[in-house]
Design a protein with these regions (language model features):
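Short beta-strand/loop motif that positions the catalytic acidic residue
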Residues: 211-213
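C-terminal catalytic histidine-bearing segment of alpha/beta-hydrolase fold enzymes
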Residues: 232, 237-281
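Gly/Ala-rich beta-loop-alpha elbow adjacent to hydrolase catalytic centers
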Residues: 168-172, 176
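A conserved short beta-strand
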Residues: 185-195
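Alpha/beta-hydrolase fold nucleophile elbow
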Residues: 158-169
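Serine-hydrolase catalytic machinery in alpha/beta-hydrolase-like enzymes
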Residues: 31, 36-42, 52-155, 252-254
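Acidic catalytic loop of the alpha/beta-hydrolase fold
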Residues: 216-221
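Bacterial N-terminal signal peptides
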Residues: 10-21
Length: 281
């Protein structure tokens, strides 16, 4: 009887271990906060953050850039976070912090650096509408040049591995996809509810692309099928997920659309981390 009783803790330990091992990535990954909780998440983060200025060669631009570091013993791959049409906000910084929590060096540049009033960036504009207009005035070649400077900075970090990816949202999602057509050394691109490049641009794409979309976002989703067809013809990887009932910007606006945005976020973020780890680690 005594021997049988002693087996119980061991059996329970085995059962617990099996339970932990069989948990899906979705059960173990923490999603970023919504826009509402972004500031608090940043204030309470235990990870190392810093602001740096990244010089862009052959220009007078110095990109004001937020960097979040993971807590890990070995070197980490780099993920460039490409802002929404609203510029470099607390929410984009909170996403970078969450990526660091998932093991990546996350770099979020303000692509409006030097283009705001008084030579400032996102924070210098008087209204969000002014920011939106300024972001929409940025040309794809300009953005590629800026992201190339950011990728070089990331590669120069002593704590970084050579592999890097982009994760973009809204306008930044489209830029993330386009950058994959312009930067052959990019290892992966994640597109959150961003439109797809032209058929002609897709011909030069190299890295795998993950696209995450809300079902109720026709302006964006209408561009998925043509891109998917072309990518298949080219033999390139383009994985897409369209989340039922979710709208544009679902990861930022998790509280909207009667839970559909939150459910989409709970599925999309683990898919993002799994994709990044597969292609960067």
């Amino acid at each position: 009887m005594v021997k049988k009783c002693r087996l119980v803790p061991s059996i329970l330990a085995v059962i617990f271990t099996l339970f932990v091992v069989t948990l899906s990535l979705a059960d173990r990954v923490v999603i970023p906060p919504s826009e509402i909780g972004a500031k608090a998440a940043l204030d309470n983060s235990v990870r190392h953050h810093e602001w740096v200025k990244i010089e862009v060669p052959a220009t007078d631009v110095q990109l004001n850039t937020f960097v979040a570091y993971p807590e890990r013993k070995d070197k980490a791959p780099v993920v460039i976070v490409v802002q929404e049409v609203y510029g470099l906000t607390d929410w984009i910084r909170a996403v970078a912090d969450r990526l660091a929590g998932d093991g990546f060096i996350a770099i979020a540049p303000d692509l409006l650096s030097g283009r705001g009033p008084g030579g400032g960036g996102t924070e210098a504009f008087a209204t969000r509408d002014d920011v939106v207009k300024a972001v929409r005035d940025l040309s794809p070649p300009y953005v590629v040049n800026m992201l190339n400077a950011v990728s070089r900075y990331g590669a120069s970090l002593s704590a970084a591995t050579p592999k890097f990816a982009t994760v973009g949202f809204c306008w930044g999602g489209a830029q993330s996809f386009y950058y994959a057509t312009a930067q052959p050394n990019l290892n992966a691109a994640v597109v959150y509810y961003g439109t797809s490049p032209t058929q002609e641009a897709l011909v030069t794409i190299r890295p795998p692309v993950l696209g995450l979309y809300g079902e109720d976002d026709a302006r964006v989703t209408i561009t998925i099928a043509p891109a998917a067809k072309k990518m298949k013809e080219l033999g390139k990887t383009y994985i897409t997920h369209i989340y039922k009932g979710a709208g544009h910007g679902f990861l930022r606006a998790q509280q909207e659309r009667d839970g559909a945005n939150l459910e989409a976020s709970r599925q999309a973020w683990p898919a993002t981390i799994e994709f990044l780890r597969k292609n960067l680690e």
